UniProtKB/Swiss-Prot annotation:
GO terms of biological process kind: singlet oxygen-mediated programmed cell death
Main location: plastid
Entry annotated with the keyword Plastid: yes
Protein origin, superkingdom: Eukaryota
Region Disordered, annotated ranges: 1-66, 278-318
Annotated source species: Arabidopsis thaliana (Mouse-ear cress)
Induction: Down-regulated by H(2)O(2).
Entry-linked InterPro entries: EX1/2 (IPR044680), UVR_dom (IPR001943)
Biological role: Together with EX2, enables higher plants to perceive singlet oxygen as a stress signal in plastid that activates a genetically determined nuclear stress response program which triggers a programmed cell death (PCD). This transfer of singlet oxygen-induced stress-related signals from the plastid to the nucleus that triggers genetically controlled PCD pathway is unique to photosynthetic eukaryotes and operates under mild stress conditions, impeding photosystem II (PSII) without causing photooxidative damage of the plant.
Gene from which this protein is expressed: EX1
Keyword annotations from UniProtKB, A to Z: Chloroplast, Plastid, Stress response, Transit peptide
Bias (Polar residues): 1-31
Signal peptide: none
Ranges of biased composition (kind: Acidic residues): 301-318
Stated name of the protein: Protein EXECUTER 1, chloroplastic
């Protein structure tokens, strides 16, 4: 059997053509990613014998021609595959480069307001989708459908990939955990991570004495600032959204923020209303000569010459038609005489029914008043004898007077309760976004400025949206200061309440409601300062909430300080300079007398300034300490501010659920009174 001869060993020597080709394989400066296509592969190499004569080499090549052709075929196929791979990657990269350049151009361009509004809609749609998916996930978990729950979790994760704020916050907390403080500071200052927390706001260019308390939280694609009133803070109720800060990332890796102010539309769908065009005074006013069949509900118009806002009666009367139908639905067959239509604000049906039930229960339990039915005959008889329209009080009035104005306190409580319910607890359905700017953003403060021109332009095209204007309430505010005092005097002297007094109380309630509703608004430039919510066991350090006056509750921030009082009567001689430790109560929410941001009271603390425990407040209340201090009083509008002597009282709070209680006694020359504050703890 013949044996196959082994082919001689051959060396591969590269020709000049091959070296030129290899030089083409080196990356050039113009095209750094892909080499040029190779020429004919036959020019790559040639076969030569390492040793032996020419005859032997020629004979061996003649004997084994198939080895040369096989090597060439292998090289050809390898080069073809290599070229095809290079061409495919080059085509793919060119397509991606074109798409990427287009995306970068879109993101790098400065967005106008219309482009931002499209982004707002996209974020809202994604947020609604996330809410639906999360609710479906909860239902799937409850019914133990884990396969469906797994799919929903994947869908939630896919939707959350567009959440720029969520990525920023997760990266921020991871950087803090890994002690990468440089990255954390960058995200805090540039990406808005430092805005999360509690802030107190005070208007810089508008005289707003009330102030704001807002909490900024990180949500899908935006930071949301919600405003809270004192009642919402004490009951942990939900706040009303006030402004938003949207976040995007451009093609260069820079963060862009756009702040928007939420102007809520005054739309209350639960209250029956009618278009103003179809309302005429003849439809709901009873003429002197005849009566209309209104279901035992008669509305009279009475003029008050002393009223400052009589010009607005026509607007107020338009709202009485819906009020009539509402009362017919709530109390069938009711007999009511409305002596004057005031503007108590648009109120929720369910809330009014609760108030009516509460009043009915109180009347059944206490039997304080017996209100007689007043029959409506004509306006002439009412004008001749106005005293017949007085509401007589029974013998229980003496008990009210003996209780030192207990009924007055109850009235204040009801008014304050209504104010707090209407000022933010009722969720508003629709809002209008208007542009705003963040300025001087720091770790402890920032400014929010509204763009007035765009605000006016946007508000003109939206029905039911009104800008805040306090001119209408300023005139009525002058008459309110002594209304409750006149009411108490009327009860004490005449044992009756006149109709005029009831009108004044109605105006007071109307103004208080309007003030509470407008208190959530912003205008111009507002400065926000960070609120430190770190828990503290020191009773003289932290947040406190208390009741004050007729308007609303107050939130103060107690702070320990060392030095001298500002604006005090201390001697300015260098030899008499004395430093001491003292505590200040700064108002986070104010009132028309002492606005927000001002010091409500202060007291020097320490054994040197401590007073005996026996004082105005009995020791049974758990008095821990008493310190001599000063309280601030002022006239409406913060006119004639003055310091009066007082004392700071600290109670142990054994009988109070909220912990320690702080009180301050005002020793004013004309009267003395005390204010109590309970500890307020906000979630960080």
């Amino acid at each position: 059997m013949p044996s196959l001869s082994t082919p001689p060993s051959q060396n591969l020597a590269f020709s000049p053509a091959a070296s030129a080709t290899s030089s083409r394989l080196t990356p050039s400066s113009k095209r750094s990613f892909y080499p040029h296509r190779l020429p004919d592969p036959t020019a790559l190499c040639r076969c030569s014998s390492s040793s032996g004569s020419n005859s032997s080499s020629s004979s061996s090549s003649d004997d084994n021609p198939r080895w040369d052709s096989a090597i060439q075929d292998v090289l050809k196929s390898a080069i073809k595959r290599f070229d095809s791979v290079l061409s495919w990657y080059a085509t793919l990269d060119n397509d991606d480069g074109e798409q990427g350049s287009e995306n970068v151009e879109k993101i790098d361009d400065d967005w106008d307001w219309d482009r931002w509004k499209k982004h707002f809609d996209q974020v809202d749609d994604q947020d609604r989708l996330l809410s639906v998916l999360k609710s479906q996930l909860n239902r799937a978990i409850k019914r133990e459908d884990y396969e469906d729950a797994a799919r929903l979790k994947v869908a939630i994760a896919a939707t959350a990939t567009n959440d720029a704020v969520g990525k920023v916050m997760s990266t921020f907390y991871r950087a803090l955990l890994e002690e990468r403080y440089k990255d954390a500071v960058y995200l805090r200052d540039k990406a808005g991570a430092g805005l999360v927390g509690w802030w107190s706001g005070i208007s810089e260019d508008v005289k707003d004495p009330f102030g704001l308390i807002v909490q900024i939280t990180a949500e899908h694609g935006r930071y949301v600032a919600r405003s809270y009133n004192p009642r919402q803070l004490s009951t942990s109720a939900a706040g009303a959204p006030l402004f938003e800060i949207f976040l995007t990332l451009d093609g260069k890796g820079n963060y862009k923020k756009q702040a928007v102010y939420l102007k809520w539309k005054e739309i209350f769908p639960d209250v029956p209303t009618m278009p103003s065009r179809t309302l005429t005074p003849g439809r709901f006013l009873t003429s002197p000569g005849r009566k209309e069949d209104t279901g035992n509900l008669a509305v009279e118009s009475s003029e008050d010459e002393e009223s400052d806002n009589s010009d607005d009666d026509s607007d107020l009367l338009e709202e009485s038609s819906g009020f009539q139908s509402f009362l017919r639905d709530m109390i069938p067959g009711v007999k009511v005489k409305v002596m004057k239509v005031t503007a108590p604000g648009r109120v929720d049906k369910d809330f009014i029914s609760k108030v009516i039930e509460q009043i009915a229960d109180e009347e059944d339990e206490e039997n304080d008043l017996d209100i007689e039915d007043i029959d409506v005959e004509d306006d002439t008889k009412a004008e001749i004898d106005e005293k017949n329209a007085d509401i007589e009080l029974e013998s229980v009035t003496d008990e009210i007077i003996d209780n030192n104005g207990g009924r007055e306190i109850a009235v204040k409580f009801v008014i304050g309760d209504i104010v707090d319910r209407l000022s933010g607890n009722q969720p508003l359905k629709e809002s209008l976004r208007s542009p705003a700017n963040l300025e001087s953003v720091e770790n402890s403060s920032f400014y929010l400025r509204l763009e007035k021109d765009l605000n006016v332009k946007e508000s003109k095209g939206v029905e039911g949206t009104t800008l805040v204007d306090g001119k209408g309430s300023r005139q009525s505010r002058r008459r309110i200061e002594n209304i409750m005092g006149d009411l108490a005097k009327s009860i004490e002297k005449e044992k009756k309440i006149s109709v005029k007094m009831l009108k004044d109380v109605g105006e007071l309630l109307s103004l208080t409601l309007s003030q509470a509703q407008n208190r959530q608004q912003l205008s111009g430039l507002t400065k926000f300062r960070r609120i430190d919510v770190t828990p503290s066991l020191d009773p003289l350090d932290g947040l406190y909430i208390g009741a004050h006056g007729l308007y609303t509750s107050e939130v103060i921030h107690l702070k320990r300080k060392f030095g001298q009082w500002k604006g005090g009567k201390e001697s300015k001689k260098p030899t008499d300079i004395e430093f001491y430790e003292y505590v200040e109560a700064v108002k986070l929410t104010g009132d028309p007398y002492v606005p927000a941001g001002k010091v409500a009271f202060r007291a020097k603390i320490g054994r040197r300034y401590e007073l005996p425990h026996k004082g105005l407040i009995p020791e049974e209340f758990g008095v821990i300490a008493r310190y001599k201090g000063q309280g601030r009083l002022a006239d409406p509008g913060f006119r004639n501010p003055r310091w009066v002597d007082g004392e700071l009282v600290i109670l142990d709070g054994k009988y109070v659920k909220g912990g320690p209680v702080v009180g301050f006694v005002y020793w004013a020359p004309e009267y003395h009174f005390v204010m109590f504050f309970n500890r307020l703890r906000l979630q960080a």
